[in-house]
């Protein structure tokens, strides 16, 4: 996109768009449970609608000072808010609005990328832009037009970055049963030759498929593994599909199509699930055990939160809004939403608790409000070859890296 057009698109103030936190209309949870910290989701305080996920944003490559700079601009805004108690609810696409400020930051990096003459630097600048555009769209609520524009910019920047960085990115199109096609990204390491053993990424509900570049760059590529990603239902390239009780539907379509992808060794495929992505990955472990060598999960959501209404009352509103949005239930009553969520439990579906032939690893943090140890243990104890991976909370960044190293090594063992 030409820089002039980008500026016109991004920075022309507009006041007609609904503010993100108003798109899902459900009963708000008590403010008493709003102060929460989760390693994978970040921190929820009384002053922000969104969970501020510094760990994951820094891990993805965003400078900590840049994060604080953007957050301070949002916090300092005097513009009208849909909720005056929440800093990130500025109405309209203008200074102080969450999407505006993060997209503006992304455009700065895009400008630097177009002016850089060094390939490695250009690629990194494009990747920085992609990360910031993705945060602009966070938490990717369905029907948020400005967020959807930011998602498009994130994907464009991500594809531009790959032209300059030392790996190959192929945009693949898969036909989906019932109509339509789905776009996925196949990341291939430069130090090996196709066909590659491949990790099928099953992502978290509030992230784009482009958010997992660091996972490929630092963990899978050095191990000689490719990474195949798609967006979760109702987000990005998967926006035409809502999340259903058959949560693994889209990923299953990809898995079955892999024999036709020449760069993938379809006999050496594993899956990795983040948060709700673990629901998808573990479901695949049962339904497609002949096609998967192993499944690893981190902070899985497969039963307890989905089936326990008391737990649901204890998580931030943003998280419940994301679930409602993915399920296509933005205007449902809490009772209807909680009843429907119960049907997504893999234990309720009759899967978990039954012996699964696929090797499964499940990592968890002590005192994780979304994934107790029992959640990970349920997965491990259901596998013929299960491995439980406890992760200490502090120091957070080092332990997160160590967990990913262990998971990558475990996955590599399964495909070698």
UniProtKB/Swiss-Prot annotation:
Keyword Hydrolase listed: yes
Keywords in alphabetical order: Hydrolase, Serine esterase
Keyword tRNA-binding carried by entry: no
Pfam family, one: FrsA-like
NCBIfam families: PRK05077.1
Assigned protein family: Belongs to the FrsA family.
Role played: Catalyzes the hydrolysis of esters.
Protein's name according to its UniProt entry: Esterase FrsA
Organism: Pectobacterium carotovorum subsp. carotovorum (strain PC1)
Gene name as annotated: frsA
């Amino acid at each position: 996109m030409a820089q002039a057009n980008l500026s016109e698109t991004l920075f022309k103030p507009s006041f007609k768009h609904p503010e993100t936190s108003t798109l899902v209309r459900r009963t708000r949870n008590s403010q008493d449970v709003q102060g929460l910290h989760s390693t994978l989701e970040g921190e929820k305080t009384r002053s922000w609608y969104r969970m501020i996920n510094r760990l994951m944003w820094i891990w993805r490559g965003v400078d900590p000072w840049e994060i604080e700079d953007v957050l301070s601009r949002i916090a300092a805004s005097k513009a009208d808010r849909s909720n005056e108690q929440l800093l990130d609810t500025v109405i309209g696409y203008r200074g102080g609005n969450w999407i505006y400020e993060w997209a503006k930051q992304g455009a700065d990096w895009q400008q630097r990328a177009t002016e850089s003459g060094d390939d490695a630097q250009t690629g990194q600048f494009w990747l920085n832009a992609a990360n910031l555009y993705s945060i602009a769209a966070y938490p990717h609520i369905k029907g948020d037009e400005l967020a959807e524009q930011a998602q498009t910019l994130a994907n464009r920047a991500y594809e531009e970055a790959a032209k300059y960085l030392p790996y190959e990115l192929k945009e693949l199109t898969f036909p989906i049963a019932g109509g339509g096609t789905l776009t996925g990204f196949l990341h291939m390491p430069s130090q090996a030759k196709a066909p590659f053993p491949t990790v099928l990424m099953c992502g978290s509900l509030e992230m784009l498929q482009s958010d997992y570049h660091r996972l490929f760059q630092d963990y899978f590529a050095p191990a000689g593994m490719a990474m195949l990603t798609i967006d979760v239902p109702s987000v990005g390239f998967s926006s035409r599909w809502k999340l259903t009780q058959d949560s693994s539907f889209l990923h299953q379509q990809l898995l079955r199509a892999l024999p036709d992808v020449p760069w993938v060794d379809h006999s050496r495929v594993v899956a990795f699930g983040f948060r709700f992505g673990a629901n998808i990955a573990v479901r695949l472990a049962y339904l497609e055990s002949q096609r998967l060598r192993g499944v690893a999960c981190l902070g899985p959501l497969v039963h307890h939160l989905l089936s326990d209404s008391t737990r649901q009352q204890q998580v931030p509103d943003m998280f419940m809004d994301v679930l409602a949005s993915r399920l296509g239930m933005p205007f449902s009553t809490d009772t209807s939403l909680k009843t429907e969520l119960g049907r997504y439990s893999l234990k309720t579906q009759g899967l978990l608790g039954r012996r699964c032939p696929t090797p499964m690893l499940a990592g968890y943090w002590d005192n994780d409000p979304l994934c107790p140890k029992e959640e990970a243990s349920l997965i491990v104890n259901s596998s013929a070859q299960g491995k439980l991976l406890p992760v200490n909370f502090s120091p957070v960044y080092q332990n997160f890296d160590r967990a990913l190293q262990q998971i990558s090594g475990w996955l590599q063992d399964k495909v070698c």
